[in-house]
């Protein structure tokens, strides 16, 4: 698995520090496939990227729409959209942060579920082969296979994930791959048989010849873990979920990445957020890191989880995130970028 550096005040003795701590910059996943750039969707501005880099964050999860990048399954990537994505990656890397590429499609291409025609596993693998070629072995670029597959059986999703990983490796890309589970890839349900087997059992079948992968999970703090409520009745469950996921990762010698999590500015929510951050910070042997949901220029100012800078004032959630960062890690050449596997 990707090596981490054993530095940083947040790590317990013998535990590496978290290298990858950042945010999702939402915007490129907005709208439908026919959306107009600059009108219906955007990519991050340098001002926003610079803000989070200056805080000491080390990774940006970058959502985008599969259909816009590849308008026809099995065909070439759209040159204009690929350039926008590539330019955004270059901008983020310019400011010293890693990038997690995130096709934000919930396990679908248009209305076709991954694994079924027309979005077959072969089509999914073809997409990843084409995208992987563009970013193969670039330091600072990791591949998130898919955002939140939710209604695919775990056993079926495993086949899709393995097909994509196989395609990525066949084209010679050694980049870190982050693999979600099904059922929204929830940390709290990871070991529960919700749909076609538990992620925590089925996804142990992931096959990567380079063994350069981790599992991406998501966890929200509201009553139903959906990330759609301002209150946080599920805060205790969220804290327990991350603790449980930590145990599972250690027992199975795996690495995890918390790709989405968010809370409102309510005091109890922020307190729970800090507990989750501490759990991960204390267990760098299990966690690669995290990316908070979310920020982005077009996020409504009143959106409860929003940490986009406004009027030069930091929201309480952002203060908690900043407190979890270690400037020594951000400055470390070993932690500033996702390195391709060398084996």
Regions found by a protein language model. Name each.
Residues 15-200, 211, 287-288:
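Active-site mouth of glycoside hydrolases
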Residues 26-27, 181, 218-219, 294-296:
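Residues at the C-termini of beta-strands that transition into short coil/loop
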Residues 41-42, 126, 133, 137-142, ...:
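Extracellular glycoside hydrolase catalytic/binding regions
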Residues 8-13:
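Boundary at the C-terminal end of the N-terminal hydrophobic targeting segment
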Residues 275-343:
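Extended, alpha-helix-rich binding/interface surfaces that flank or overlap catalytic cores
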Residues 62, 259, 293:
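The conserved SAM/SAH-binding core of class I Rossmann-like methyltransferase domains
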Residues 1-6:
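Bacterial N-terminal signal peptides
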Residues 72-74, 112-115, 269-272, 302-305:
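Short secondary-structure transition/capping segments
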């Amino acid at each position: 698995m990707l090596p981490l550096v054993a530095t940083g005040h947040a790590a317990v003795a013998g535990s590496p520090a978290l290298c990858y701590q950042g945010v999702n910059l939402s915007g490129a996943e907005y709208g439908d496939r026919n959306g107009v750039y600059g009108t219906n969707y955007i990519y991050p501005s340098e001002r926003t990227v610079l803000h989070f880099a200056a805080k000491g964050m080390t990774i940006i999860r970058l959502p985008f729409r599969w259909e816009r990048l590849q308008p026809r399954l099995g065909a070439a990537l759209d040159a204009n959209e690929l350039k926008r994505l590539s330019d955004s990656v270059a901008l983020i890397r310019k400011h010293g942060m890693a990038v997690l590429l995130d096709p934000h499609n919930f396990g679908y291409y248009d209305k076709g579920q991954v694994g079924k025609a027309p979005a077959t596993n072969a089509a999914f693998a073809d997409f990843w082969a084409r995208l992987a070629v563009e970013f193969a072995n670039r330091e600072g670029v990791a591949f998130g296979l898919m955002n939140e597959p939710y209604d695919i059986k775990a056993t079926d999703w495993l086949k899709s994930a393995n097909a994509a990983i196989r395609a990525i490796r066949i084209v010679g890309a050694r980049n870190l791959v982050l693999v979600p589970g099904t059922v929204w890839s929830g940390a709290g349900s990871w070991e529960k048989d919700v749909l076609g087997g538990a992620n925590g059992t089925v996804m142990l079948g992931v096959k990567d010849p380079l063994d350069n992968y981790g599992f991406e999970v998501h966890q929200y703090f509201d009553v139903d873990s959906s990330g759609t409520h301002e209150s946080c009745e599920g805060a205790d469950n969220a804290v327990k979920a991350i603790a449980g996921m930590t145990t599972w990762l250690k027992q199975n010698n795996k690495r995890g990445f918390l790709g989405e999590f968010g809370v409102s500015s309510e005091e109890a929510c922020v307190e729970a957020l800090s507990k989750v951050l501490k759990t991960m910070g204390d267990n760098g042997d299990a966690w690669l890191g995290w990316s908070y949901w979310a920020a982005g220029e077009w996020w409504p100012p009143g959106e409860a989880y929003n940490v986009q800078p406004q009027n030069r004032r930091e929201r309480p959630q952002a203060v908690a995130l900043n407190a979890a960062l270690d400037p020594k890690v951000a400055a470390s050449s070993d932690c500033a970028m996702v390195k391709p596997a060398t084996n």
